[in-house]
């Protein structure tokens, strides 16, 4: 799968899209939660920097919400 690179609390992080649980939009940012070895991690990336797979997950989540 594809890795998503993002900054969280000033720290550079990277997570595999297969570990992402939930995706939603906040303005022009794409926020998500992911499985961080049993804990829930959080992250956000701008829409323009988000990989296509993450945008596809966002589109699917928005469709299911309606």
Swiss-Prot record:
pH dependence: Highly stable from pH 0 to pH 12.
Pfam families assigned to the protein according to its UniProt record, in alphabetical order: 7kD_DNA_binding (PF02294)
Residue runs in coiled coils: none
Organism the protein comes from: Sulfolobus acidocaldarius (strain ATCC 33909 / DSM 639 / JCM 8929 / NBRC 15157 / NCIMB 11770)
Summary of subunit composition and partner proteins: Monomer.
Coarse class of the protein's main subcellular location: cytoplasm
Upper classification of the organism: Archaea, Thermoproteota, Thermoprotei, Sulfolobales, Sulfolobaceae
Name of the featured protein: DNA-binding protein 7d
Temperature notes for this entry: Hyperthermostable.
Record-stated family: Belongs to the 7 kDa DNA-binding/endoribonuclease P2 family.
N6-methyllysine carried by residues: 5, 7
Nucleotidyltransferase found in the keyword field: no
Alphabetized InterPro entries for the sequence: Chromo-like_dom_sf, DNA-bd_7a-e_arc
Any further remark recorded for this protein: Sac7a and Sac7b are truncated versions of the Sac7d protein, most likely resulting from post-translational processing, or degradation during isolation.
PTM info: Lys-5 was 70% monomethylated in form 7a, 25% in form 7b, and 20% in form 7d. Lys-7 was 50% monomethylated in form 7a, 40% in form 7b, and 50% in form 7d.
GO terms for cellular component: cytoplasm
